[in-house]
Swiss-Prot record:
This is Putative cytosolic acyl coenzyme A thioester hydrolase-like. GO terms for biological process: acyl-CoA metabolic process; fatty acid catabolic process. Its main location: cytoplasm. Acyl-CoA thioesterases are a group of enzymes that catalyze the hydrolysis of acyl-CoAs to the free fatty acid and coenzyme A (CoASH), providing the potential to regulate intracellular levels of acyl-CoAs, free fatty acids and CoASH. It comes from the Eukaryota. The lineage of its organism: Eukaryota, Metazoa, Chordata, Craniata, Vertebrata. Expressed in all tissues examined. Up-regulated in nasopharyngeal carcinoma (at protein level). One of its GO terms (molecular function) is long-chain fatty acyl-CoA hydrolase activity. Homodimer.
Length: 252
């Protein structure tokens, strides 16, 4: 729901009265906080706001609240910052220019520009990990990184894709969270919940018919939490000329 709310407001903003029609594609999810659980029977309220635009991207801040329909009580359950890029409807490989947003104060633009530069640097710093491959280890020792490693393989079908036959970002995020959950449960031997996601980078699009390999490994543990790195690789089985590539990565 958070991803869809951001996509709606971003697509509305990047389609002016005159010009090429485009759709907003999710490029990065900043640190996502899971503050409170949402219970069965509660109503979810999702609100999205555009807080900054650069030449080719837009920053959206999304809050999710839960409402108890019996008592009327509301509480903030999730909040996240997302970055979208406008892709042309006629050529999805073409990134269009983003219309500017009107700020109430000059400080808002300056703060947004700082956040933009920060996330851009972070994306560049994580690019060196794009060559990493999580290799399985035979008979690993318990309570080691190799022992907790987990992977899932998924064939991308039509129900996973958009109108342009590319995978929905939310589908990839769901499977990444499942891999992290399996890995954490294997290490801790108990049920766990996701507390936060540091950042998800969507580096490349995944087409219908590709095989996704989602791999996870532990990078740090404390007394009450674990940090997990999840990587998504894609193999295009219908096009043998295209090599395996890194599609997304996250620390959770």
């Amino acid at each position: 729901m958070i991803k869809e709310a951001g996509a709606i407001i971003s697509t509305r903003h990047c389609n002016p009265q005159n010009g090429d029609r485009c759709v907003a594609a999710l490029a990065r999810v900043e640190c996502t906080h899971f503050l409170w659980p949402m219970c069965i029977g509660e109503v979810a309220h999702v609100s999205a706001e555009i807080t900054y635009t650069s030449k080719h991207s837009v920053e959206v801040q999304v809050n999710m609240m839960s409402e108890n329909i019996l008592t009327g009580a509301k509480k903030l359950t999730n909040k996240a910052t997302l970055w979208y890029a406008p892709l042309s409807l006629t050529n999805v490989d073409k990134v269009l220019e983003e219309p500017p947003v009107v700020y109430f104060r000059q400080e808002q633009e300056e703060e947004g520009q700082k956040r933009y530069k920060t996330q851009k640097l972070e994306r560049m710093e994580t690019n060196w990990r794009n060559g990493d491959i999580v290799q399985p280890v035979l008979n690993p020792e318990p309570n080691t990184v190799s022992y907790s490693q987990s992977s899932l393989i998924h064939l991308v079908g039509p129900s996973d894709c958009t109108l342009h036959s590319f995978v929905h970002e939310g589908v990839t995020m769901k499977v990444m969270d499942e891999v992290a959950g399996i890995l954490a449960a294997r290490h801790c031997k108990t049920n766990l919940v996701t507390a936060s996601m540091e950042a998800i980078n969507f580096d490349n699009k995944i087409r219908k018919g590709c095989i996704k390999t989602i791999s996870g490994r532990m990078t740090f543990t404390s007394n009450k939490s674990v940090e997990i790195e999840v990587l998504v690789d894609a193999d295009c089985v219908v096009d043998s000329s295209q090599k395996r590539y890194r599609a997304a990565s996250v620390f959770t």
